[in-house]
C-alpha cells in the first residue's frame, strides 16, 4: 500500500483544498493518507525544507508535488509498484 503524506501547516487554505482533493484519490487507489503539520512535526527540518512551498505531497516519502496536485499524475504514481511492499 502506498502512503501519501500531505505536508501542511495551520492556516494554510491551499492545504485544506489539496486535502479535500487527496481524500477521494487515495481512497479510490487504496493508498494511506497521512497529514503532517510541518510546524508541529517531530522533525524540525520539515519546516525548514518545505515550509515555504506548502502544500507539499509526498508519495512513499519522496516529493511528488507542491502547491498543485495533478489527479491523473498522482493516480498513475499510485497505480505503480509499491517500493515497500512486503515490509509490513
Where on the chain are the PLM-derived regions?
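Structural motif corresponding to alpha-helix initiation and N-cap regions
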Residues: 43-44, 71
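Non-catalytic, surface beta->alpha helical segment in thiol-disulfide oxidoreductase systems
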Residues: 62-88
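Thiol-based oxidoreductase modules, predominantly thioredoxin-like and allied folds used
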Residues: 31-43
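Short, low-complexity, intrinsically disordered N-terminal peptides in bacterial proteins
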Residues: 1-3, 24-32, 79-88
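A short, hydrophobic beta-strand/beta-hairpin element that forms part of a small beta-sheet core
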Residues: 54-63
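Local sequence-structure signature of Cys/Sec-based thiol-disulfide redox active-site neighborhoods
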Residues: 1-25
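Thiol/disulfide oxidoreductase modules built on the thioredoxin-like
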Residues: 47-53
Amino acid at each position: 500500500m502506498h502512503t501519501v503524506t500531505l505536508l501542511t501547516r495551520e492556516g494554510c487554505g491551499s492545504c485544506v483544498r489539496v486535502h479535500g482533493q487527496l481524500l477521494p484519490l487515495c481512497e479510490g487507489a487504496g493508498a494511506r493518507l497521512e497529514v503532517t503539520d510541518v510546524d508541529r512535526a517531530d522533525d524540525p527540518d520539515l519546516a525548514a525544507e518545505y515550509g515555504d512551498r506548502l502544500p507539499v505531497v509526498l508519495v512513499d516519502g519522496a516529493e511528488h508535488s507542491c502547491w498543485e496536485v495533478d489527479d491523473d499524475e498522482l493516480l498513475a504514481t499510485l497505480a505503480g509498484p509499491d517500493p515497500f511492499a512486503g515490509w509490513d
